[in-house]
Swiss-Prot record:
This is Pollen allergen Lol p 3. InterPro entries: Allergen_Lolp2, Expansin_CBD, Expansin_CBD_sf. Residues 14-94 form the Expansin-like CBD domain. GO terms for cellular component: extracellular region. It is found in: Secreted. It comes from Lolium perenne (Perennial ryegrass). Belongs to the expansin family. Expansin B subfamily.
């Protein structure tokens, strides 16, 4: 499984819009959740077309962690993928542990 997360236009201090390339033959993403640095809580991201979005009342705190659930039942957690000072247009590729 290969995963790339590209920060898209519309992202700012309180909003994160991602184009997620999830490459696993015969499988697609069903759910994506984000956990901010220092938080215990996973926040669901909303799918809009091919993009995933989360809006926060307060500025997002990185490095941000992600949890994926695929339609085929695969679960993946990626820690410290996107920093607080992310760059729109940049692709972040998580490390597999």
């Amino acid at each position: 499984t290969k995963v790339d997360l590209t920060v898209e236009k519309g992202s700012d201090a309180k909003t994160l819009v991602l184009n997620i390339k999830y490459t696993r033959p015969g499988d697609t993403l069903a759910e994506v959740e984000l956990r901010q640095h220092g938080s215990e809580e996973w926040e669901p991201m909303t799918k809009k077309g091919n993009l995933w979005e989360v809006k926060s009342a307060k500025p997002l705190t990185g490095p941000m962690n992600f949890r994926f659930l695929s339609k085929g039942g695969m679960k993946n957690v990626f820690d410290e993928v996107i920093p607080t000072a992310f760059t729109v247009g940049k692709t972040y590729t998580p490390e597999y542990n």
